Amino acid sequence: MNKFLLASIAALFTWNLQAQFWSEVDSDFPTESTGISRFSIVDENVAWGIGYNGINPENNIQQFSKTTDAGSTWNAGSIGIGNTNLGIGDIAAIDGQTAFIAVYPRIAGQNGGIWKTEDGGGSWAKISQTEFTSSGSFPNTIHFFDTDNGVVTGDPVNGNWEIYTTADGGSTFTPVPAANIPAPQTNETGYLAQNTASGDSIWFTTSTGRIFHSTNRGLNWNVYQSPISDFGGSEVSGDISFADASKGILQTNAAILYSTTNAGQTWTQIVTSGTGTPYGDNIAYLPFTSYIVSVGSDPNFAGSSYSVNDGVTWVNIDTKQHVDVAFLNTSAGYSGGFTSDTNTTGVFKYVGDVLSAGDEFAFAKAISLYPNPTRNELNISGTDRVLNLELFNLSGQSLKVFQPSHSLSLEGLPTGLYLLKITTPLGMQSIPVLKN
């Protein structure tokens, strides 16, 4: 095992760096220069994105595009919400049929809110008339942790942040009490689609450079000051992403990077190296890995790049315009592009193996078993990352299915060698377990 891990570590630095990374496919938006400002990836087959006008973002677009075949083809559709002046700020997809959107007012006197589709985007309905109804209400972000639990964040209203949670699949949303959220600073607001999540933890960023953080799906919040003064200003802006509940990265519009290992409470500037550079727009950690992808859309500083060591060393991928970037794991990831008259552009689909060559190493860092060999009890670390545990004998027969837990009982099983199949967001791996 140790030799294998050492070989995996060495492989991190010996990949073919010229391997293909992106495959550009048609986003199916009908108008040229339509971009994708936000992705929501459900699984390796299903992902949704929302469109925007790449020539003049002030020209409102109410459109989505969706794939159900792992990004090979995308089908665009209109978001019919009954008012063409409302903006589509963020999207949270549940499956190929169901998705939620955060809708914001673009004209004074109107109200946004939360809309939902249950027929693949064919029709959209407002959840209720009770959320974001004040004159200053402005929904910014929406995220679902699973099919039942979600959170929507908005700007402050009457001196308090307007945040709602749901635990019933979006049938009802409950306001988070002001006592559970640190008070806003003077003129502080949030930003459209500027949130990131890992497990039960979620973060959103603000106009004063602060980062709000919840560890319980939005029910309670803490706030930390970041190294920058604004996450969406004309002079200073930034983006954040987290690999897990603690490890994160912050990228500024000047391509300066900061890292955190305590969920964003403190940040340390990264001294970068390598032949490439991070870009100044969006950044994405691949969950539970050391891999990061950075993208930029500024025509004077456009492109994409990646790092395999938490943002220290960078390799350039291309110099095309990229908007949003999102990864589910080491095999499913997308970046937003723009449509063209050739009907061949709009979505960058990850097709390489650059970010999967070190899966064994990343998996080993995420999960550990001890003691191994064992008599009866087997302890497991990193259970917050475990989706499923199943024990097999060497003949391939399933013996036990465990609920994710810190301790697994092998009592009643004869001594011998077994295989524990562990499923995490990184994929599946079978680890030998010896019972004495």
What do these predicted regions represent?
Residues 277-280, 314-328:
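Conserved blade-ending motifs and adjacent loop-strand segments that build the rim/top face
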Residues 20-29, 57-80, 113-131, 162-182, ...:
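Asp-box/BNR beta-propeller loop motif
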Residues 417-436:
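C-terminal tail/sorting-segment detector
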